[in-house]
Amino acid sequence: MNTSRFISLFFHGSLVKRIIVGLVLGVVTALISPDLEPVLGFNLAEKVGILGSLFVKGLRAVAPILIFVLVIAAIANKKVGSKSNMKDIVMLYIIGTFGASIVAVLASFSFPMYIPLTTVADSLTPPNSVSEVFVVVISNIFANPIEALATSNFIGILAWAIALGIALRHAAQATKNAVNDLAEAVSKIVHLVISLAPFGIFGLVAATLADKGLGALWDYAHLLLVLLGSMLFMALVVNPFIVYWKIRRNPYPLVWKCISVSGLTAFFTRSSAANIPVNIDLAEELGLDEETYSVSIPLGATINMAGAAITVTVLTLAAVQTLGIPVSIPTAILLSVVSAVCACGASGVAGGSLLLIPLACSLFGISGDVAAQVIAVGFVIGVLQDSTETALNSSTDVLFTAAVCMAEERKNNA
């Protein structure tokens, strides 16, 4: 196989398969490095750790501009004047996201986690109360936009993005198209960075195992079990309860239909945006109101973020527990909901929720360097985490739309 063909295969093949290869090679490198050290004169696993460091730096670089342009584009291009039960559907989106945050917090406190971090800052300044968190949030909102982008002040970035998005809703269509083109360009850069994930995972796993030993794998396995368990609980317990509250009959036939059609496809595409056509077809098959689902499903792909709420909450609280920062459950729920809401606009990007972790971490006084390591941990487990998160997010879009439409139909027939 020539070099160009190898490069094409590696960069255009399945990302999941490539990450698995990087993960396996990282483990193998860590295992054989001690035996090779007398021959090479250095520990190979420690040296390849530079690949992981560069990957983390790339993630930190793209995260601020990614959130900025995607949120502007999402708000500026939002359709105006459509009713069609949207208030009820958006309310379910909000309830679902908040419920996911609660599930994630309870799971994190019930099964405390430790994740291996290479460096831990000594100058942590965790908030002492909810009121202090509000002070931090409000002060960060009024930051200079350029400074916010340069310093990764995600709250300030979000505030300016929302304000600009609202202002641009009344701009000329050509301006909105330009904003969309910019968002698409940034997304392509993000995909380029994420395409390097196998190299980054290879370096991160090798260096982590060389430093922490094989026991670090259990830390990742524990974290993954908490994440997936929370998402499954949300999909199979909380969501059916919400649907039953709306339609007043057995919700599981509808839940299974949405999971088997929408969730299964989204699991492999790992993109809520890419799964929109599947959800549209399913909504049509279910006989839902076209005026409603044609708006609610694309909107849900942007703002319905139950899976992201779980991911950001669990990983952030894992970092909090690792660093020994005391935090009450109400404060954890508040901060987790804030971070989940900030995920708006990033759901169409594979791994997008991971890039929001620095926002939640910053509210606990955790430094950007440590937050970037938490993102890297997320990519290590992302083969299943991101796929399951997307499956939950996307299947819930059509599930809640169907629930509201069926409830309206039941009301009209009563």
From Swiss-Prot:
Keywords: Amino-acid transport, Cell inner membrane, Cell membrane, Membrane, Symport, Transmembrane, Transmembrane helix, Transport. The keyword Cell inner membrane applies. GO terms for biological process: serine transport; threonine transport. Coiled coil: none annotated. It comes from the Bacteria. It catalyses: L-serine(in) + Na(+)(in) = L-serine(out) + Na(+)(out); L-threonine(in) + Na(+)(in) = L-threonine(out) + Na(+)(out). It holds the Pfam family SDF. One of its GO terms (cellular component) is plasma membrane. It is found in: Cell inner membrane. One of its GO terms (molecular function) is neutral L-amino acid:sodium symporter activity. The chain crosses the membrane at residues 19-39, 55-75, 89-109, 148-168, 189-209, 223-243, 297-317, 323-343, 363-383. Belongs to the dicarboxylate/amino acid:cation symporter (DAACS) (TC 2.A.23) family. Involved in the import of serine and threonine into the cell, with the concomitant import of sodium (symport system). This is Serine/threonine transporter SstT. It comes from Actinobacillus succinogenes (strain ATCC 55618 / DSM 22257 / CCUG 43843 / 130Z). The lineage of its organism: Bacteria, Pseudomonadati, Pseudomonadota, Gammaproteobacteria, Pasteurellales. The gene is sstT.
